[in-house]
Design a protein with these regions (language model features):
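Structural and coupling elements of P-loop NTPases
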Residues: 1-214
Length: 214
């Protein structure tokens, strides 16, 4: 699982207080993979603690993304939070734990791979930060889905065979097999114009087997 602390642009935003609540109330081994660049009306972006790069968002919808060095005034805090991240993952990943014991700094790919292993094993939850309304940090959250969550062929999905007394069937991620998926959201009347003739339903589907083709 991934966590996203939203509304870092709101008055009173305190993402690390929320992170502590995630640990205390949900009992998760969680640590931030982001450090906010400013809060409330000063929130401009985040520092990625994995890549050690500052990512800022501008434009009307956060569509202009700038990647640069960590601001000097944040370097001490960023170093501290990155160390916390490495410690949290090291507790549940032996490979990264060796870096920690040797007091070595892991490379970006080493840390990213360790976070992925621990996330898939459900022993660690990476915590992202941003503002969904202003589209800041959402792009990095989607990158996190790719980087840290399992691909379809890496998990076991089970369906019910309706023609065989609802017997359980294990699905394999074979694109040539008959389509099986989960329709998890329906938007009725989601036409591209206001004309009744153009109204149709959009079905959001998560395929587990096979492929959906027009």
């Amino acid at each position: 699982r991934l966590c996203f602390i939203n509304k870092c642009d709101r008055t009173g935003a305190d993402p690390f207080r929320v992170l502590q609540q995630v640990r205390d109330k949900l009992k998760l081994n969680a640590a931030a993979v982001h450090y906010p660049i400013g809060l409330e009306d000063q929130h401009d972006g985040v520092v990625c603690l994995v890549t050690h790069k500052a990512v800022t968002f501008s434009g009307k919808s956060g569509e202009i993304i700038t990647i640069g060095d960590v601001p000097e005034h944040l370097r001490d805090q960023v170093a501290k939070k990155r160390k916390e991240l490495v410690e949290a993952v090291s507790e549940v990943d032996d490979t990264l734990g060796e870096f920690f014991l040797r007091e070595e700094t892991p490379e970006v790919e080493d840390l990213r791979a360790a976070i992925r292993r621990a996330t898939i094993a459900r022993t660690f939850s990476p915590v992202f930060m941003g503002s969904a309304f202003k589209n800041r940090g959402v792009q990095l959250l989607l990158d996190g889905v790719v980087d840290y969550l399992p691909a379809p062929h890496e998990v076991e999905n089970v369906a019910l065979d309706l023609d065989n007394d609802e017997a359980s069937v294990t699905l394999t991620a074979d694109p040539k097999a008959p389509l099986v998926g989960l329709a998890f959201k329906l938007e009725e009347g989601a036409g591209l114009s206001q004309s009744p003739r153009s109204a149709f339903a959009i079905v959001h589907t998560r395929p587990a087997k096979g492929a959906l083709r027009p």
